């Protein structure tokens, strides 16, 4: 095993990377509230794992979406647990994200030179809410259907482009199969890629600039 490690160490400099990661200075004023962002990340990883597991059984059609969710809950081994964890973790992720935003704002973490970290965080917050909106509709039950109908109808109040935005969200003039397909695609492909990119940027900025000082 030592020879294998030495082979990788010679090429990747694993020890140097490990020392750089573990030797970062942590200011003495840091407390448990500075962990809220990390907890949000953990919730996202749980979301990713449980959501990925459910894609093996979920059917994104208006005729089969609800029955496939019932199948996950009642027939799939531990399916009820996986979906329940997905729902609980979603709520926890939103809560931790809100608390994290408040912590950063109240401690002045958005000030120079961390403006871009703050902006990327706000974008991540918008993406997180978008996850909630798109995921809420996927069971295609009464609650999900009417939630989509209301959300997709709100932009119609915008002058000139409102109807165009609503039609884009619905995939047409009314809520139907095209709507569910778009929300499923956004929830499982578009939004995960977006949040991964902005998370990487967010963490790199934190790594580069360090944790903000006390007020």
Swiss-Prot record:
It is a multi-pass membrane protein. The keyword Cytoplasm does not apply. It is found in: Cellular thylakoid membrane. Pfam families: Cytochrome_B (PF00033). CDD domains: Cytochrome_b_N. Heme c binds at residue 35. GO terms for cellular component: plasma membrane-derived thylakoid membrane. GO terms for molecular function: electron transporter, transferring electrons within cytochrome b6/f complex of photosystem II activity; metal ion binding; oxidoreductase activity. GO terms for biological process: photosynthesis; respiratory electron transport chain. The chain crosses the membrane at residues 32-52, 90-110, 116-136, 186-206. Keywords: Electron transport, Heme, Iron, Membrane, Metal-binding, Photosynthesis, Thylakoid, Transmembrane, Transmembrane helix, Transport. Its cofactor is heme b; heme c. Heme b 2 binds at residues 86, 187. Heme b 1 binds at residues 100, 202. Binds 2 heme b groups non-covalently with two histidine residues as axial ligands. Binds one heme group covalently by a single cysteine link with no axial amino acid ligand. This heme was named heme ci. The keyword Iron applies. Component of the cytochrome b6-f complex, which mediates electron transfer between photosystem II (PSII) and photosystem I (PSI), cyclic electron flow around PSI, and state transitions. The 4 large subunits of the cytochrome b6-f complex are cytochrome b6, subunit IV (17 kDa polypeptide, PetD), cytochrome f and the Rieske protein, while the 4 small subunits are PetG, PetL, PetM and PetN. The complex functions as a dimer. Heme 1 (or BH or b566) is high-potential and absorbs at about 566 nm, and heme 2 (or BL or b562) is low-potential and absorbs at about 562 nm. Belongs to the cytochrome b family. PetB subfamily. This is Cytochrome b6. It comes from Nostoc sp. (strain PCC 7120 / SAG 25.82 / UTEX 2576).
